[in-house]
């Protein structure tokens, strides 16, 4: 009890001295001080835990701020998206309003144009009615002149004039009628109040249009002023935006974004107003063109009337010539018809003959085709049988290879068994083997399996021999039946050849079925062989395991000689059975060779049959050389067969791949066996090493016994070393605290870095999503651009067509100008009006020149827009290239991020391992501290004991002679002291080893800390680089968004332009339809006039014919024909007179 209390006292005293409490301590107050000390330790630990928890709480609060940052960023992003959506909504509203306004303007234009067209239609209808009335009046007058009931005066030979009552009365005109004073017949005024004078209406319309043009010019000036004001305001806003962007370098607030969006909307409004101004200018130009076209249509109508009158005269002359030609043609037609009837009769006879010949030829062709189809089918079957034969040969070859492989395997098994016997003999010589009940049973099972394999191979050989005998019989049968086939072919009877071919076909089909069965048997045999191979592998593994267990047992224990003799006998039996199996295997090989020779014979027979069939096929082809054109169908079948052969080659490659897989498995098994042999060699080497270690340990024991004697001298040195150890332990404690603080800081930093990495991963994921969205939007824009380009190309084509039509109209316009000049010469009365019209025409020409200049400007603008489009296409290409670069960079960054994630995971794992090692170290340090304190206490106790013993020894030296009985007790004490010294020496060695291990661990920890510091610095650098790259990416994304926004604006402007062009096209199409309707109306009128003209011509021809008859009758009667000639001349002049 006293020793325990003294130990407690010493321990508490030392701890108090370490903590700085140097006050005196009584023995009575020991338990109280112990409790107080334990409470102090508990409070310090609780303080540490509180500090750790407070630090963790602070970290969590910092983490909360860090976690809230992405939410804040998302909130700002959502605000931006909301603003953008609002802007898009405003844009859509503006677009809808503009579209409604454009539709209203188009409606107004259409209503005006319809009113104008109605007006023109009414005028044209009125003109047509007037012309119809004039034509009717002229027709009536002509009829009156022709059919007046005047008496014909006939001049007799005596010079008298006599009235003829019974002849038709003819009008005698001595002189032409005097020209009428009135230039034209009075035209009744139209009853329709909507019809008015065209010139007055045109003048009024021109004045109205001029007023509208002036109003539009005033509006244009106002709009230009407004545009200038807007441009100034935009410049001021841009300056303010630049100032605000300089003020807000860190980030953009939603107010700034709203200002930017407002500026962009203002710019869009200005662009839209410019587009509207251009549209109004174009509308003015179109109105002016429409006025010119109306004037031109007016002139063309007048010219057409004159042209029709001239054509009527020409047609009268042409009709007489046509009548003569018609008579000639009728005569020629009658002759041609007669000859054609004769030729038709002959052709019908020839056609009947050809039809009969064609039917006969078709019947022959059908027969030949049927025979050819049969021959082709038989050829295809023979080809398929050849392919099956080749497949069988490949399978036989594979089986030979597998048999060779199995023979090699058996040889390897024999070699391994020999090695096993050698090892067993060696083990028997060294230690002896202890027999168990399991090994002979496994060997029996192995031998039984080998016997079953032998029986199985024998059965398969018998099956193969049976199949080959059947095939040889079938071949011999076919060979016997060949000579009559040849005789039949020599005779040339096709029917006998067909029967023989059908028989051979049936035989080949049977052979095919047999071969298929044989193939199925071979496949099943292959499956069974693979299963048996797996079983052999399992048995081989089990044998290896048994060998390993036997080796272990041989190392652990020794076996008697009779067990070894039994094992050797069993081994000899197994070897004899293996030899017997190898002999059987060689017999099987010889049988396989015989089978292969028989296969070769069968192959030669089949080749002969194939040659005979090819000879028959050649004969058929020589007989039917006319149908060579239809042999192209055979090529398709050959191609299909080639495809089948390719598929079968692929199957063969798969089979070879399986065989290579089996070879790899065998190589792996060999490698495993080699590894097991190496492991056995390593175990033997280790055994020899351990024996040497045992000898060295015995030598060390002897050395330690010598060292124990020197320990008494080293005790003094050890006391000094313990003091140094205390100092070093205190320094180590300080370093340990410092390291713990640094580790805590590093863990905090690592946690922060992990959180930052998580946030960056989220940002990267968002960027990926945005990049994908941009990709989809770019694809959509490209599709829209392609569609727009197509529409523009179609519109350009339409414009080219309209330009061509305008050129045609210009040509017609020149013709109409020429006709107008003729009309001006004819119409002297309209000179004043023509002068006024010429002045107006000059003004219109000036306006036309102005319009041409405007058109040139418009063309220059179009070229400029085309250049802008090309530049924008280049920009789009650059954007695509940049996008690809960004995509590649993003992929690189993804790879880097994945690498960083892997590094982070490795760092986390390292940190976890460091934490675990640190905990282990702490536990070891605590244990070592406890042990050190115990050893120190023991050392102090020993020191006190040694001091007391020294005193006692001095006393005993003085009292040695007196107290010989106390010597024995002192010797016992010395022996106990020696034991304690031995224990102390051993403890010292352990302590030195532990100190060395601790020093090594500290060095490792310092190196790891340095590595961690370097890695953290690298991570910081990477983080800074990633931040810079993210900023660059954000700037690039912002620029891309701006460019996409600009491209969207341009596309919107292009859409508006395309809509305007479409509207223009619709207007032009509507005008074309109206013009086509007018032309159709005019054509109908022209047809009516032509019909009237034909009627007049007929009447004239009838009159001419009657006059000629009258002249002939007068000549017969002997009357003079001069008055009749005058009468003939007069009606020729009458139409001119009437036209005048």
Swiss-Prot record:
Protein name according to UniProt: Centrosomal protein of 135 kDa
Region (Disordered): 1117-1140
Stated role: Centrosomal microtubule-binding protein involved in centriole biogenesis. Acts as a scaffolding protein during early centriole biogenesis. Required for the targeting of centriole satellite proteins to centrosomes such as of PCM1, SSX2IP and CEP290 and recruitment of WRAP73 to centrioles. Also required for centriole-centriole cohesion during interphase by acting as a platform protein for CEP250 at the centriole. Required for the recruitment of CEP295 to the proximal end of new-born centrioles at the centriolar microtubule wall during early S phase in a PLK4-dependent manner.
Subunit structure: Homodimer. Interacts with CEP250. Interacts with DCTN2.
Alphabetic keyword roster: Coiled coil, Cytoplasm, Cytoskeleton, Disulfide bond, Phosphoprotein
Localisation: Cytoplasm, Cytoskeleton, Microtubule organizing center, Centrosome, Centriole
Annotated Low complexity bias: 1117-1131
Biological process, per Gene Ontology: centriole replication; centriole-centriole cohesion; positive regulation of establishment of protein localization; positive regulation of non-motile cilium assembly
Domain of life: Eukaryota
PTM sites of type Phosphoserine: 439, 688, 1130
Annotated site residue numbers, Microtubule binding: 101, 104, 108
Domain-related comment: Coiled-coil domains are critical for microtubule binding via the formation of a two-stranded coiled-coil structure in homodimers.
Main location: cytoplasm
Alphabetized GO MF terms: microtubule binding; protein homodimerization activity
Phosphothreonine modifications at: 1121, 1134
Organism: Mus musculus
Residue ranges that the Swiss-Prot or TrEMBL entry lists as coiled coil: 75-151, 199-416, 447-644, 668-1036, 1079-1113
């Amino acid at each position: 009890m006293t020793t325990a209390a003294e130990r407690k006292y010493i321990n508490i005293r030392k701890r108090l001295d370490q903590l700085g409490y140097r006050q005196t301590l009584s023995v009575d107050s020991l338990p109280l001080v112990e409790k107080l000390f334990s409470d102090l330790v508990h409070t310090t630990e609780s303080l540490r835990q509180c500090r750790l928890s407070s630090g963790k709480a602070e970290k969590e609060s910092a983490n909360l701020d860090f976690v809230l940052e992405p939410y804040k960023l998302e909130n700002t992003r959502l605000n931006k998206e909301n603003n953008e959506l609002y802007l898009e909504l405003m844009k859509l509203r503006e677009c809808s309003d503009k579209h409604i306004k454009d539709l209203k303007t188009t409606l107004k234009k259409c209503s005006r144009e319809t009113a104008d067209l109605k007006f023109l239609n009414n005028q044209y209808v009125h003109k047509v009615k007037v012309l119809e009335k004039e034509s009717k009046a002229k027709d009536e007058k002509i009829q009156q002149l022709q059919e007046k009931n005047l008496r014909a005066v006939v001049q007799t030979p005596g010079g008298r004039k006599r009235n003829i009552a019974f002849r038709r009365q003819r009008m005698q005109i001595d002189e032409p009628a005097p020209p009428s004073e009135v230039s034209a017949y009075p035209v009744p005024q139209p009853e329709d109040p909507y019809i008015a004078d065209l010139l007055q209406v045109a003048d009024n319309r021109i004045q109205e249009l001029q007023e509208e043009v002036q109003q539009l010019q005033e509006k244009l000036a106002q709009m230009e002023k407004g545009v200038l004001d807007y441009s100034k305001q935009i410049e001021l806003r841009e300056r303010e935006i630049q100032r605000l962007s300089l003020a807000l370098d860190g980030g953009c607030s939603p107010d700034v974004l709203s200002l930017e969006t407002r500026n962009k909307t203002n710019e869009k409004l200005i662009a839209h107003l410019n587009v509207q101004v251009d549209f109004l200018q174009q509308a003015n130009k179109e109105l002016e063109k429409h006025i010119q076209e109306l004037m031109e249509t007016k002139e063309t109508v007048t010219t057409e009337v004159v042209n029709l009158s001239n054509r009527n005269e020409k047609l009268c002359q042409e009709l007489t010539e046509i009548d003569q030609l018609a008579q000639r043609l009728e005569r020629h037609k009658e002759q041609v018809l007669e000859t054609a009837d004769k030729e038709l009769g002959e052709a019908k006879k020839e056609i009947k003959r050809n039809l009969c010949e064609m039917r006969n030829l078709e019947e022959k062709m059908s027969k030949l085709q049927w025979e050819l189809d049969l021959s082709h089918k038989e050829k295809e079957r023979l080809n398929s049988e050849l392919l099956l034969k080749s497949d069988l040969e490949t399978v036989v070859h594979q089986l030979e290879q597998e048999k060779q492989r199995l023979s090699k395997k058996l040889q390897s098994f024999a070699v391994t068994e020999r090695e096993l016997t050698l090892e067993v003999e060696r083990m028997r010589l060294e230690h002896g083997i202890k027999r168990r009940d399991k090994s002979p049973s496994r060997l029996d099972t192995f031998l039984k399996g080998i016997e079953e394999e032998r029986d199985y191979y024998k059965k398969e050989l018998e099956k193969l021999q049976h199949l080959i005998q059947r095939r040889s019989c079938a071949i011999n049968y076919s060979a016997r039946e060949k000579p009559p086939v040849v005789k039949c072919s020599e005779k040339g009877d096709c029917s006998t050849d067909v029967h023989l071919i059908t028989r051979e076909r049936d035989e080949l089909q049977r052979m095919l079925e047999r071969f298929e069965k044989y193939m199925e048997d071979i496949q099943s045999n292959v499956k069974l062989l693979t299963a048996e191979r797996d079983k052999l592998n399992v048995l081989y593994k089990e044998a290896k395991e048994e060998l390993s267990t036997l080796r272990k047992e041989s190392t652990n224990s020794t076996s008697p000689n009779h067990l070894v003799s039994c094992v050797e006998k069993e081994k000899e039996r197994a070897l004899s059975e293996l030899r017997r199996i190898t002999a059987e295997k060689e017999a099987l090989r010889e049988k396989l060779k015989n089978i292969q020779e028989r296969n070769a014979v069968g192959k030669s027979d089949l080749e002969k049959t194939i040659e005979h069939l090819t000879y028959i096929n050649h004969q058929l082809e020589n007989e039917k050389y006319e149908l060579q054109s239809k042999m192209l169908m055979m090529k398709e079948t050959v191609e299909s067969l080639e495809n089948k052969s390719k598929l079968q080659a692929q199957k063969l490659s798969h089979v070879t791949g399986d065989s290579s897989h089996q070879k790899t498995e065998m190589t792996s098994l060999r490698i495993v066996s080699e590894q097991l042999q190496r492991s056995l060699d390593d175990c033997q080497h280790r055994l020899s090493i351990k024996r040497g270690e045992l000898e060295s340990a015995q030598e060390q024991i002897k050395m330690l016994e010598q060292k124990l004697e020197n320990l008494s001298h080293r005790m003094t040195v050890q006391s000094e070393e313990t003091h140094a150890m205390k100092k070093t332990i205190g320094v180590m404690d300080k370093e340990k605290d410092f390291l713990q603080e640094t580790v805590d800081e590093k863990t905090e930093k690592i946690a922060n870095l992990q959180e930052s990495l998580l946030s960056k991963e989220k940002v990267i994921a968002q960027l990926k999503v945005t990049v994908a969205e941009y990709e989809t939007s770019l694809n959509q824009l490209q599709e829209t651009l392609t569609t727009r380009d197509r529409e523009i190309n179609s519109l350009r084509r339409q414009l080219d067509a309209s330009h061509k039509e305008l050129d045609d109209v210009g040509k017609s316009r020149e013709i109409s100008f020429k006709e107008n000049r003729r009309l001006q010469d004819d119409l002297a009365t309209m000179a004043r009006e023509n002068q006024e019209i010429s002045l107006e025409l000059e003004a219109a020409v000036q306006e036309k020149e102005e319009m041409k200049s405007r058109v040139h400007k418009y063309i220059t603008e179009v070229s400029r827009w085309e250049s802008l489009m090309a530049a924008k296409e280049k920009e789009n290409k650059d954007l695509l290239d940049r996008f690809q670069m960004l995509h590649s960079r993003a992929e690189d960054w993804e790879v880097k991020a994945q690498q960083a994630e892997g590094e982070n995971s490795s760092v986390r794992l390292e940190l976890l391992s460091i934490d675990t090692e640190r905990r282990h170290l702490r536990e070891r340090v605590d244990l070592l501290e406890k042990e050190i304190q115990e050893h120190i206490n023991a050392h102090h106790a020993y020191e006190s004991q040694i001091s007391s013993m020294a005193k006692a020894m001095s006393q005993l030296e003085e009292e040695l002679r007196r107290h010989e009985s106390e010597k024995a007790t002192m010797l016992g004490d010395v022996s106990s002291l020696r034991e304690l010294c031995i224990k102390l020496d051993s403890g010292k060695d352990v302590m030195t080893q532990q100190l060395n291990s601790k020093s090594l661990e500290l060095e490792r920890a310092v190196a790891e800390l340095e590595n961690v510091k370097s890695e953290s610095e690298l991570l910081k650098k990477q983080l800074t680089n990633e931040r810079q790259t993210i900023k660059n990416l954000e700037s690039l994304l912002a620029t891309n968004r701006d460019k996409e926004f600009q491209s969207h604006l341009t596309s919107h402007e292009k859409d508006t332009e395309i809509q305007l062009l479409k509207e223009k096209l619709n207007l032009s199409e509507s005008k074309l339809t109206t013009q086509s309707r007018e032309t159709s109306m005019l054509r109908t009128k022209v047809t009516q006039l032509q019909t009237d003209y034909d009627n007049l011509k007929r009447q004239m021809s009838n009159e001419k014919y009657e006059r000629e008859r009258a002249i002939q009758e007068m000549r017969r009667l002997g009357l003079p024909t001069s008055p009749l000639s005058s009468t003939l001349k007069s009606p020729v002049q009458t139409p001119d007179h009437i036209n005048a």
